[in-house]
């Protein structure tokens, strides 16, 4: 009778060991997946930030060109500054 109890206990231990190994492998796979997702998120964040920076730079350039165009259309754009003002600006 005790022989069957020992066999049953060994069977339970083997099943528990198998379940433990399975759960361990699932956890390892989830950790790998999490790491891959973190890396992907970092690269996407960098790409998005670069895209935003490019858009800001493009808008700033457009605005600067627009201001230059407006200034060039004003009559004062072709007026010569007095030499004293030019000297002060060069300092």
Swiss-Prot record:
Pfam families in UniProt: DUF2570 (PF10828)
UniProt superkingdom: Bacteria
Entry-linked InterPro entries: DUF2570
What is the membrane topology here?
Answer: Single-pass membrane protein
Q: Where in the cell is it found?
A: Membrane
Per UniProt, the keywords (alphabetical) are:
Membrane, Transmembrane, Transmembrane helix
Q: Where are the transmembrane segments?
A: 7-23
- According to UniProt, the name of this protein is Uncharacterized protein HI_1414
What is the source species? Haemophilus influenzae (strain ATCC 51907 / DSM 11121 / KW20 / Rd)
């Amino acid at each position: 009778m005790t022989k069957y109890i020992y066999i049953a206990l060994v069977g339970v231990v083997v099943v528990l060991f198998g379940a433990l190994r399975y759960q361990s492998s699932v956890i390892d796979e989830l950790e790998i997946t999490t790491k891959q997702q973190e890396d992907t998120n970092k690269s996407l964040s960098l790409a998005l930030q670069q895209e935003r920076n490019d858009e800001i730079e493009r808008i700033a350039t457009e605005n600067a060109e627009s201001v230059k165009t407006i200034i060039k259309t004003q009559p004062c754009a072709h007026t010569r500054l007095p030499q004293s003002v030019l000297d002060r600006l060069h300092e």
